[in-house]
């Protein structure tokens, strides 16, 4: 391994003498009739023939400039509302080019002002990228990037997550480069809106797919923040500190140092107000996920995520991946991060970040659960829990792009994450059968866990002299390791008509889990004839996962003084090996606005499962699948396009799903894995239509996606009608549940999303309307009978955001969500519930520096538990005064939860139960805060 690293380093640095020819390009946009400067015009330079695009806006003087433009043939395009667009094709020699005045012809008469102004272009469509003009959305002086994107059509910011075009934003780039790794929250909450020129929304593809142009469907929704030209040589940021009642405090800041391509940012934060300007990385599954991923046997996650049927969350976001947003409960946060970006010797583009955060969470929950059972008796439970957790996260990300020459480049992406978590919890659960208390369980649990992820992607791409002929190879490696221990004590009481029964359990567990993966992918593209090309692909993956979970039962008889005994039922030593070969061929067509590709691949999988304890076996399975994929994009014109994608893929069960080790963290809800699980096959079809009318400043977006899964991995649940012996020494009390994953057909899903946005000059505001309809059918087995949980979710959202001035900013919004849930097995548990949230956000700067900010929200709930207040009013109010030069300093007093009605409500729906969850939240407090904004330009 060390020898290979040395070879790679020698290869990298031996190429330092090879330089690409790059230069600068500038010009000025002016009106043809009066030669007046045109500000905020959109200027794009597009490479010919591969259509790579770089875009910026003209300054107040009408001027624009592009740095580091490579030698080649380009098309320049300039657009602005009220003018005819212009286009020119030119050759660039890689040195410097001044294009002089570029004249735009007005489509209507203009005023006689020195500078031509007006409502800026709201958005424009550039292939698969939607670009918003930041100057078209007025925000106050201290607004963040998150405040800016809230105003943009189709963008929704809620519960710490940003969604656009119906998908969650996974990454935010700054001028095309990562900021704080893969954490979108860090960029949006910490970067000031005034530094932003454009925001681009697109589906980011892998480095290999972007190089070859072959869309493989493995995309993530990404925002690219294009900074203003005058902010690229500046230092800016802010620092703040505050203290309030109940010993509440808040301190932090971010400072950015920009000098051309060299950029450095440092951010820090400390508070006990549940403020978190970043997303935590959850390697252990302890910060909100219900799966308990990576936890020792008996481990109890501190919270729950939604089941497959859908959910509503208040006070926390859905947890579906390692990056999670704010946690419910009372959270104390300390965080520090740095981000670095620069070009080295013209050939190297380097970006790196390090982030550290520490959180302490005091969480209390009340969970009302209704079970989906086909039995004469109704069954429900109430759980009351208290937990304390102490969590540390470190993460390091780096990206190095080496432009060897005009035909070759290399990208290296190393990543390292580390997490540790110490937690304790006390849980009391009562089970009621026909409204009579049947049993009660009290569990005292504590754990200490550590997790580490290390990965690296190495990509190399080569373009041959023949147009369209390319070759690429990518090597991806990863290693993960989780370890820890836990201790659990449970007291179980069961109530009968003639007598009561009680039992206790004391145990401790150890976890040692690790795995690695090596993936190599080769792609070669050959042009066949005009507009057609063929691509050949081969991929090889080797993955090994090992999980040792050992649980020891304490001896409860102090007189015998026996040592703890290893439990074979609660322990397992398991290993899973996967070898994958994929060979595929794609045919692509690209001409006159139509791009299409058809791919067929053959995937061979060999899965070997090895158990060493408590049973010894070695089992090997092989799977072979023909997998089609189709992609099409058609541009009707420069303002509208249609995109369609179909894919068939297979996924194999994880080691956690395969390993048959009993989890008895709750004696009333036991679970285990299933060694007999097979692969699952999924079909996905997605269609998306986008239209942007620059002249009318309106935008329309529509998306619909269908999903179908064969051999879907679901749950097989057994509910005991009477005390049942599952394993030797393991008793499932009456009303208890035992769950195991199974393969089952019949999973179907549909997602749809509509968005319309328009600038309304009459009220000088942007109006955004969005709607969505989601549908899912999730099959499962309950007491040997098939149940299909069907969920329909309808959501409507309307937002009016002001565009009046930088002193007055208001947003009026309302969101209505209607949810229908049906179960084929138990019709009596069919339910529908309605949630509506309406809010008014106001930020007003008046009399030269006085500030009032108000955020009022009404929440209405119908169809949830009777214990939940159907009407909740939340109001945060603050007053402040700006002072010092350019009003850079501010002193503000804030009243949080003026009406004392803050809450945290969650509805979780799974295949076998429905939960209504209430969590503790911050109560009313007052805070005095001082903020100073740093601004130093033209360094």
Spans of model-derived segments:
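Short, ordered, surface-exposed loop/turn motifs in non-cytosolic proteins
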Residues: 33-47, 123-125
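Short, acidic Ser/Thr/Gly-rich low-complexity loop/linker segments typical of extracellular
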Residues: 48-63
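Conserved C-terminal beta-signal and adjacent last beta-strands/turns
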Residues: 797-801, 805-815, 830-939
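Signature of Gram-negative outer-membrane beta-barrel scaffolds
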Residues: 533-637, 828-830
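A short, solvent-exposed loop/turn motif at the edges and junctions
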Residues: 48-51, 73-89
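Outer-membrane beta-barrel translocator domains and adjoining extracellular loop/strand segments
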Residues: 212-213, 278-283, 363-379, 388, ...
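Outer membrane beta-barrel strand-and-loop segments of large Gram-negative receptors
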Residues: 384, 517-519, 564-572, 678, ...
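Membrane-proximal, glycine/serine-rich, low-complexity loop/turn segments characteristic
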Residues: 21, 63, 77, 84, ...
């Amino acid at each position: 391994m060390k020898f290979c690293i040395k070879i790679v380093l020698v290869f990298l640095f031996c190429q330092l003498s090879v330089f690409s020819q790059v230069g600068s390009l500038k010009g000025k946009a002016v009106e043809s009739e009066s030669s007046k400067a045109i500000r905020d015009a959109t200027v794009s330079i597009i490479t010919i023939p591969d259509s790579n695009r770089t875009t910026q806006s003209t300054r107040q003087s009408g001027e624009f400039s592009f740095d580091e433009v490579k030698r080649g043939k380009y098309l320049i395009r300039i657009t602005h509302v009220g003018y005819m667009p212009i286009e020119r094709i030119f050759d660039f020699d890689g040195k410097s080019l001044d294009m002089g005045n570029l004249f735009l012809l007005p489509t209507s008469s203009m005023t006689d002002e020195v500078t031509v102004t007006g409502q800026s272009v709201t958005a424009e469509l550039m292939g698969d990228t939607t670009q918003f003009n930041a100057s078209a959305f007025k925000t106050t002086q201290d607004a963040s990037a998150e405040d800016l994107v809230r105003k943009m059509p189709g963008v929704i910011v809620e519960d710490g997550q940003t969604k656009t075009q119906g998908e969650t934003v996974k990454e935010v780039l700054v001028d095309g480069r990562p900021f704080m790794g893969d954490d979108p929250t860090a960029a949006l909450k910490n970067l000031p809106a005034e530094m932003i020129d454009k925001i681009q929304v697109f589906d980011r593809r892998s480095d290999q797919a972007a190089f070859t142009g072959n869309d493989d469907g493995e995309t993530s929704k990404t925002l690219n923040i294009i900074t203003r030209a005058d902010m690229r040589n500046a230092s800016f940021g802010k620092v703040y500190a505050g203290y309030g009642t109940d010993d509440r405090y808040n301190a932090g800041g971010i400072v950015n140092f920009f000098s051309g391509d060299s950029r450095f940012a440092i951010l820090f934060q400390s508070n006990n107000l549940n403020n978190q300007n970043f997303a935590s990385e959850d390697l252990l599954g302890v910060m909100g996920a219900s799966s308990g991923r990576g936890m020792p046997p008996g481990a109890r996650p501190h919270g729950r995520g939604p089941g497959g049927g859908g959910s509503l969350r208040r006070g926390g976001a859905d947890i579906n991946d390692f990056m999670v947003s704010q946690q419910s409960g009372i959270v104390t946060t300390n965080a520090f991060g740095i981000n670095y970006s620069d070009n080295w010797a013209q050939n190297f583009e380097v970006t790196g970040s390090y982030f550290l955060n520490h959180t302490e969470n005091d969480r209390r929950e009340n969970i009302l659960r209704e079970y989906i059972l086909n039995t004469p008796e109704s069954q429900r439970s109430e759980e009351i829990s208290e937990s304390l957790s102490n969590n540390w996260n470190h993460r390091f990300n780096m990206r190095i792009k080496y432009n060897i020459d005009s035909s070759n480049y290399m990208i290296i992406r190393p990543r390292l994450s580390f997490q540790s978590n110490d937690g304790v919890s006390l849980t009391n659960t009562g089970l009621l059968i026909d409204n009579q208390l049947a049993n009660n369980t009290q569990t005292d649990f504590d754990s200490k866990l550590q997790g580490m992820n290390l990965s690296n992607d190495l990509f190399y791409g080569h373009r041959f002299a023949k147009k369209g002929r390319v070759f690429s190879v990518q090597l991806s490696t990863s290693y993960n390791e989780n370890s820890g221990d836990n201790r659990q004590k449970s007291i179980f009481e069961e109530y009968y008509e003639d007598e009561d029964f009680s039992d206790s359990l004391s145990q401790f567990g150890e976890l040692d889990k690790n795995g690695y993966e090596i993936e190599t992918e080769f792609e070669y593209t050959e042009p066949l004839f005009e507009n057609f090309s063929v691509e050949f692909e081969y991929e090889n993956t080797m993955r090994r996962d090992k999980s040792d979970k050992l649980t020891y039962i304490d001896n409860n008889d102090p007189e015998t003084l026996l040592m703890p005994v290893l439990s074979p039922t609660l322990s397992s030593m398991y290993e899973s090996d996967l070898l994958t070969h994929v060979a595929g061929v794609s045919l692509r067509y690209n001409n006159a606005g139509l791009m299409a590709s058809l791919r067929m691949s053959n995937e061979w999988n060999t899965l070997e499962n090895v158990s060493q304890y408590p049973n010894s076996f070695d089992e090997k399975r092989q799977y072979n699948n023909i997998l089609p994929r189709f992609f099409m994009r058609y541009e009707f014109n420069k303002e509208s396009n249609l995109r369609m994608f179909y894919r068939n893929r297979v996924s194999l069960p994880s080691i956690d799903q395969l390993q048959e080790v009993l989890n008895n963290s709750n004696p009333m809800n036991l679970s285990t894995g299933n060694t007999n699980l097979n692969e699952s096959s999924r079909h996905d079809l997605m269609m998306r239509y986008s239209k942007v009318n620059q002249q009318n400043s309106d935008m329309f977006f529509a998306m619909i996606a269908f999903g179908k899964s064969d051999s879907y991995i679901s749950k097989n649940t057994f509910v005991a009608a009477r005390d049942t012996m599952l394993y030797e020494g393991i008793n499932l009390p009456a009303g208890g549940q035992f769950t195991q994953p199974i393969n089952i057909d019949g999973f179907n899903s549909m997602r749809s999303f509509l968005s319309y946005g328009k600038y309304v000059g009459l009220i000088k505001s942007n109006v955004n309307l969005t709607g969505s309809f989601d549908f899912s059918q999730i099959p499962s087995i309950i007491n040997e009978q098939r149940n299909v949980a069907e969920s329909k979710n309808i959501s409507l959202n309307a937002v009016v955001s002001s565009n009046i001035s930088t002193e007055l900013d208001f947003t009026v919004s309302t969101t209505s969500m209607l949810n229908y849930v049906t179960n084929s097995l138990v019709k009596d548990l069919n339910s529908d519930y309605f949630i509506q949230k309406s809010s008014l956000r106001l930020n007003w700067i008046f009399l030269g520096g006085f500030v009032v900010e108000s955020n009022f929200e009404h929440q209405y709930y119908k169809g949830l538990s009777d214990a939940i207040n159907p009407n909740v009013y939340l109001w945060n109010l603050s007053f402040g005064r700006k002072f010092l030069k350019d009003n850079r300093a501010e002193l503000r007093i804030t009243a949080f939860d003026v009406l004392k009605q803050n809450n945290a409500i969650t509805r979780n729906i799974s295949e076998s139960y429905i939960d209504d969850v209430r969590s503790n939240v911050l109560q009313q407090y007052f805070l005095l805060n001082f903020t100073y904004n740093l601004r130093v330009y033209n360094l």
